[in-house]
Amino acid sequence: GDVYKRQVQPAQVLGAPRKGLSVVFSGDTAPCPYYLQAAHDADLLICDATYALPEQEDQARQWGHSTFGQSATLAAQARAKRLWLTHYSPMITDPEEYAAQAQSIFPAAECGFDGKSITLQYEEAQP
């Protein structure tokens, strides 16, 4: 058969350059500088929140986990846009009971759950 050749230029198929999207996930993680660096400006940060209470920080650190407050602090320091808290201790029967604690530090904190989803939107390019 016939073969047609046509050169396509990037401007014909690409939009204006824009910042990409980032999702940062880490489980079984205590706060550390590397995690903060990786989470910088994340569109969605998904964090360990095994322990609920601030007085459990030493226990969390000992076992390589985080508290709700520590994860919220990390999200704030990293300038993340959203935070989903996950990996709850079996002792936490209703994570929503502790959500306000995290939201007082980082208002965009939410409790994650199986099947939770989100559609992240690109930011429009600035002229």
Task: List each language-model region with its residue ranges.
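Short, small-residue-biased leader/transition segments that mark boundaries at the very start
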Residues: 1-4
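Cap/insert and terminal regions of metallo-dependent hydrolase folds
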Residues: 7-117
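Short, surface-exposed amphipathic charged segments that create phosphate/polyanion-binding patches used
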Residues: 121-127
